[in-house]
């Protein structure tokens, strides 16, 4: 029986300042570091042992993974970083203060941008200096693949090939896996794993630094789900 642990990165500096982050590479806040270390202790206390680890190419998720693995004495396990586990790209909203954006466009519109399954945010042009096209961590990607903005539907479509090619085969082989990623890439995975509807996924919250443990049978049917609370 394989186990999968999903953990959203600890609080980031832009979580703290209430800014849209997306693909911007923001570090953990002091609280975020504490959350990640505490999550590692929870993992250790629960006796969870992993065979493989996956994370995004963004610092806040990578550091969270490393803190969790270090605290649980598993820093040595194989680790893969991929852009496919990145946070949802928030387009032209990235860097904006959420409260100020709501005051400008209205609470309802911002809620739709943040939580709707299939509504895109205002897009960021590839010519913009903040475009990920200019970031060397994506240099090997076709520029046409690099997004200028995503909704949860597009995020799921981005995540799924990696799930099917890299993660699911390991779980089917009975291996235990940990994924440290982001609120929306993990919401996308949870939607698929739990078969959550397009409407209900809007209400799913992923708390920072909280490990979520799934137990699967040999066909990847979910047998149980548990949150290792703070």
UniProtKB/Swiss-Prot annotation:
Catalytic center residues: 9, 87
UniProt KW keywords: Gluconeogenesis, Glycolysis, Isomerase
Reaction equation(s) it catalyzes: (2R)-2-phosphoglycerate = (2R)-3-phosphoglycerate
UniProt keyword Plastid present: no
Function in brief: Catalyzes the interconversion of 2-phosphoglycerate and 3-phosphoglycerate.
Keyword Isomerase: yes
This protein's encoding gene: gpmA2
GO biological process: gluconeogenesis; glycolytic process
HAMAP family, per database record: PGAM_GpmA (MF_01039)
Site feature Transition state stabilizer, where: 182
Organism: Lactiplantibacillus plantarum (strain ATCC BAA-793 / NCIMB 8826 / WCFS1) (Lactobacillus plantarum)
Name of the protein in its database record: 2,3-bisphosphoglycerate-dependent phosphoglycerate mutase 2
InterPro entries: His_Pase_superF_clade-1, His_PPase_superfam, PG/BPGM_mutase_AS, Phosphogly_mut1
Pathway note: Carbohydrate degradation; glycolysis; pyruvate from D-glyceraldehyde 3-phosphate: step 3/5
NCBIfam families in alphabetical order: pgm_1, PRK14115.1, PRK14116.1
Family matches, as PROSITE patterns: PG_MUTASE
Gene Ontology MF terms: phosphoglycerate mutase activity
Assigned EC number: 5.4.2.11
Protein family according to the UniProt entry: Belongs to the phosphoglycerate mutase family. BPG-dependent PGAM subfamily.
Binding site for substrate: 8-15, 21-22, 60, 87-90, 98, 114-115, 183-184
Superkingdom of the source species: Bacteria
Pfam families per UniProt: His_Phos_1
């Amino acid at each position: 029986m394989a186990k999968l642990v999903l953990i959203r990165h600890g609080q980031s500096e832009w979580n703290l300042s209430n800014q849209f982050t997306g693909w911007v590479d923001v570090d953990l806040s002091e609280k975020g570091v504490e959350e990640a270390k505490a999550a590692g202790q929870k993992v250790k206390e629960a006796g969870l042992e992993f065979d493989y680890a996956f994370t995004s190419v963004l610092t806040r998720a990578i550091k969270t993974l490393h803190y969790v693995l270090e605290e649980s004495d598993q820093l040595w396990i194989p680790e893969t970083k991929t852009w496919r586990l990145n946070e949802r790209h928030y387009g032209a909203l990235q860097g904006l203060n959420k409260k100020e954006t709501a005051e400008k466009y209205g609470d309802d519109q911002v809620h739709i941008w943040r939580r709707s399954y299939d509504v895109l945010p205002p897009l960021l042009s590839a010519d913009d200096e903040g475009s990920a096209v200019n970031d060397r961590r994506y240099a090997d990607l076709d520029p046409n693949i690099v997004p200028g903005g995503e909704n949860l539907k597009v995020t799921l479509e981005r995540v799924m090939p990696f799930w099917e090619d890299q993660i699911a085969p390991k779980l089917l082989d009975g291996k235990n896996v940990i994924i440290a990623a982001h609120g929306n890439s993990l919401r996308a995975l949870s939607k698929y794993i739990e078969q959550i509807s397009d409407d209900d996924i809007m209400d799913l919250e992923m708390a920072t630094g909280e490990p979520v443990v799934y137990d699967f049978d040999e066909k990847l049917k979910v047998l149980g789900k548990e949150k290792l609370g703070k």
